[in-house]
Amino acid sequence: MSVSSGATYDVDATDTIQSLSGAGNIELASGITLTTGDGGNDTLSGVISGAGNIVKAGSGTLTLSGTNTYTGTTTISGGTISIAADNGLGAVPGSATAGHLTLNGGALQSTADFTLNSNRGIALGVSNGTINVDRSTTLT
């Protein structure tokens, strides 16, 4: 799915899509999960907001370059989510939240110097996962 600049994809029920790209925004309703995954490499530069959850499944890389504000969880079950800032993963929880970011067979890729907030409560699922840091950058 490609979301055009100026458009908003309102996700009001749990949904699975093959791809996610574009400069438009995503609004996640409370408690729902948006799962995306395919073998391609996609970039979403719009803002993901709301109280829902994101799951990256399948192979390929999903680059989240917007200043995201969603408050739900992020699970990487396959492929890679690539970010250049902590807010690529949405709003930081007000206190440590176990499993706010779950690696379960996929990878988180950092592409710039930044600090991943400890309140995200990184968890490893049964399939484990990895955190990859681009050469010449620092993730703390």
What kind of region is each of these model predictions?
Residues 1-42, 49-63, 71-139:
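Beta-strand repeat architectures
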